[in-house]
Each structure stands twice: as C-alpha cells, then as structure tokens.
Amino acid sequence: MNNNKIKIIGGGLAGCEAAWQAAERGVAVKLHEMKPERYSPAHHLPGLAELVCSNSLRGESLDNAVGLLKEELKRSGSLFIAAALATRVPAGGALAVDRQLFSDYITEKITNHPLIEVVYGEVAQIPEEGIVIVASGPLTSDRLAASIATHTGNYLYFYDAIAPIVTADSIDFGKAFRASRYGKGDGDDYLNCPMDETTYKAFVAALLGGDKVAAKDFEKVVHFEGCMPIEEMAERGPETLRFGPMKPVGLPDPRTGVEPYAVVQLRQENRDGTLFNLVGFQTKLTYSEQKRIFSLIPGLEHADFVRLGSMHRNTFINAPQLLLPTFQLKNTPRILFAGQITGVEGYVESAGSGFMAGINVARLAKGGALTVPPPTTALGALVHHITSVDTKHFQPMNVNYGLFPELGGKVKKKDKRARLAERALTDLTEWQGMVQD
C-alpha cells in the first residue's frame, strides 16, 4: 500500500499544505521531512512548517493582494491559514503568529491525519516511480538538488538576484520615454528614465549611503559580474554605473534628441504591460532604503513598488520553462513542484502553491482532470505569472495586484483594488463549485 502513496519531499509550508489537501480528498500521502535527523543552516525547530525568517504573514486587508490570497485560502480550507488564525499574535493590520505554536499546530494536524505518514530523514533523490511533489524549499540539500537537476537541466538556480518592480500606472510618463538601445527590437521595448549630471551624482551618493541588509551566515554569496548589487557597483567609482546598467549610449531622449547623462531602464515584466522591473537593479539595500533611493529616479518619484529587490540563497527552478500551470513538470508530469522552489516568494505564496499541488496530485491519483484557478483570482494570477512569463529573465515573485488581468471599463484608481478583490472572490466561488472533489 505504501508504494501507492503520494510522496511529498519537504515538510515546510508548501509540503504540509499539499499533504493536507491531498489527504482531505481521500488520497494517502507519505510526507518526507529531513528534520530532526538533519537541519539546514536556517532551521532550528524540530517540528513541521517552521517559519525561518519573520513571524509575519503580512497584511490582512484586501487592499493588498497577499490579504486577498489569504482570504482565498481561508475560504478553500487551507491548513496554513487555520494554523495562523489559531496561533496569531497582535501585529496591527498584519497576521503574525507565534512560530512555535504555529509549527506545533501543523505538526499535530499532519501527524494525526489517518492518511498521512510522516517519514523523517533526508531524501537524496526523486523517486523513480509514482506521483511525487518536490517541496524542498530554498535550502534544498545538495544531494537532492543534484537529483532535481537531472530533471531540470540547467534551469535550476541557487541564488536569486531580484530587481524591484513597479506598476505601470504609477510611472510618470511625462519624464520616462520609450526606446530600445539603438532602436533594436521593436524600437520601444524599454521605458527609460533619464538623469542629468546633478541628479545622477545625487543618486549615486544616496546608493553609497544606503543601509544594507546583513547577510546570514548561510547566505554568503560570491557575486558574478552580471549579478552585482547596484550599490556595490557604485562603490567601484562614481562613473561605474554610467558605463554599466545606467549607460545612456544609444538612447537619445526623443524630446531633446540628446543622450541623457545616465538612464535607468525599465523592462516590461508581464504580457499585460502592467508591471515593469528596474533592469540591473538587484540590490541588498533594506526595503525602506530602496523605496527612498529609487524614488529619486526621474519618473519614479511616486512609483508603487510591488516587489523590492533582494539577493539571497534560494534554490528555485525556472518555472515558466519547466512547469505546467498545474505545477507538473512538462517532461515528467508525475512529478510536481511546490513552494519557493517554484519561484513564488513569501510564506503565503508558498502555502498557496502547496494548496494547488495538493489538489492536483489528488486528482491525478484518482485519474481526474487537473485544475487551475482563474487568473482573476490571487491564486490563479500567481500561478499564471510563474508559469508563463519570459523564461530568460525569470526571478521569484510575490503576489501583487499588478499580476491580475485588467478590469473592463474605467475604474477610479482608489476603487481598483476593491473591484479586483470583489471579482476574485466571485470567480473563486465559481471555480470551487466546478472542482468539488
């Protein structure tokens, strides 16, 4: 009987959520967790679903997409959300938890479920047969990573280099102009924020004086030239950025016909053109400093940053290259991935991916049709993004309203998020009715 069980590698947020969802649908699960036999450098608690960084699950308001995602998971019977609500601590408008009680809650639920068997010990390779979910997290062990690489080839990464992303409707197009360097491509593939000499020097000075995030011992990264933090490039000399990611050559401002002193380029992040990332602006600046300093860029003074930059240890796959929207490997559909290893960023997003993977392995085991939530929902928007964006520039992403399809007709900006949330919950209810197991 054990050979027929769904195998889930990793007892973190995604793995536990996937195990719960599959078991609740009548499918037997074997959940593998390497603790307490072996700990990663970031883990300390012996239980399942350990929160290794902050104890905050971020805001609850539907004005934030992560709040909507939590509401969708709550309405869908998520173990992760049930645990969070049962172990919450005061945190203003955020949902924060007692991390020990949170882990204890999930460990108790998982270990006492009649259809879940927890096996402790490291899994060194993906099983050669049967349905498997890989949810081994950002600190996947070296041996398992080597096994994963046999299925993913060169599309497995060990460090992320995330540049900030802003919403298109928050960019001042009176200052930014569209153009590609030397008119290549379609000629207007990039947004360009021009700087004069005074603005550039003030910007570099701000970068050099900005507060940085201290790296943890297990996150010591050797930076390659093409992946250097923007502030470390600035440390090489005052003109370095002008001859690197901010070089103005081949980008004359159409309003003056003259090349600016320096240029910050923004590249379209999604097909709908609602999001743009700051090209080459991977950074270790703190989030508050990023908002302050990057708002000095002409055209971004009032930018809405939906993702801020970071660089840290993070094992993840190139999801749009490798995964179907069902979280199955395209070339080996019996294998699914879930959690941060898929390129979702954040606790709630990891649990959400585990939720979907768990539903789909249950359907796969029963011979049913697999399912994907509508892209108008927070779950669906996130899934759609990580499995459909440009494979060349893929980096982990958190849920945000910039991922959602636009609303039809004119909507006031102050009402937009409420309307997006209302549409999402309506479409979620309809989808739930269609996929009742």
UniProtKB/Swiss-Prot annotation:
Pfam families: GIDA (PF01134). The keyword Membrane does not apply. Gene3D superfamilies: FAD/NAD(P)-binding domain. Its EC number is 2.1.1.74. GO terms for molecular function: flavin adenine dinucleotide binding; tRNA (uracil(54)-C5)-methyltransferase activity, 5,10-methylenetetrahydrofolate-dependent. It is found in: Cytoplasm. InterPro entries: FAD/NAD-bd_sf, MnmG-rel, MnmG-rel_CS, MnmG_N, TrmFO. It comes from the Bacteria. One of its GO terms (biological process) is tRNA wobble uridine modification. GO terms for cellular component: cytosol. Keywords: Cytoplasm, FAD, Flavoprotein, Methyltransferase, NAD, NADP, Transferase, tRNA processing. Its cofactor is FAD. The keyword tRNA processing applies. It catalyses: uridine(54) in tRNA + (6R)-5,10-methylene-5,6,7,8-tetrahydrofolate + NADH + H(+) = 5-methyluridine(54) in tRNA + (6S)-5,6,7,8-tetrahydrofolate + NAD(+); uridine(54) in tRNA + (6R)-5,10-methylene-5,6,7,8-tetrahydrofolate + NADPH + H(+) = 5-methyluridine(54) in tRNA + (6S)-5,6,7,8-tetrahydrofolate + NADP(+). FAD binds at G10, G11, G12, L13, A14, G15. Catalyzes the folate-dependent formation of 5-methyl-uridine at position 54 (M-5-U54) in all tRNAs. Belongs to the MnmG family. TrmFO subfamily. This is Methylenetetrahydrofolate--tRNA-(uracil-5-)-methyltransferase TrmFO. It comes from Geotalea daltonii (strain DSM 22248 / JCM 15807 / FRC-32) (Geobacter daltonii). The lineage of its organism: Bacteria, Pseudomonadati, Thermodesulfobacteriota, Desulfuromonadia, Geobacterales. The gene is trmFO.
